[in-house]
């Protein structure tokens, strides 16, 4: 990845990190998960850092330092697109979603396979999914996040890049809050911290996506 792109990917993450320091894949139709993030008090520094992280509007277009990196990305994109075809039949829509997810997950320091697994469990890859708790979109982001760290417009959570950006930033926040403990962070993301059912579902889904070339 080029220096400029890498700087953009890492710069926003450093801001909120600094603040926080004080088998084969089977895609099945699932209802949106009923669990949801819980609104918790945020220190002003954390709120500001998270707001800066979601506000950066750099386009999700990857740049690579070498031909090998670019070829690896293209192989991943092709394999992921093929696996996602049953859920997203239109090729341009599928590719745009995957390109955006790859960018936003890498930007937040997350594995694309983990984010794909979370989206699979949370929404079944449905852009306009709404849970019983009111969580929205691919990553089932609760509307209060738009008020806490966004511009207050919760309808934007149905926009692909906005939803994936918020979801990735929130998961990164929970990971940092839990000292890197993925099970606890995933539980917190779903509003079921300390229980294993939801994290195990996400990690199981991640294994399928991790097998991509």
Could you say what each language-model-derived stretch is?
Residues 25-27, 132:
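Sterically constrained small-residue positions within well-ordered secondary structures
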Residues 56-213:
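Catalytic glycan-binding domains that act on GlcNAc-containing polysaccharides
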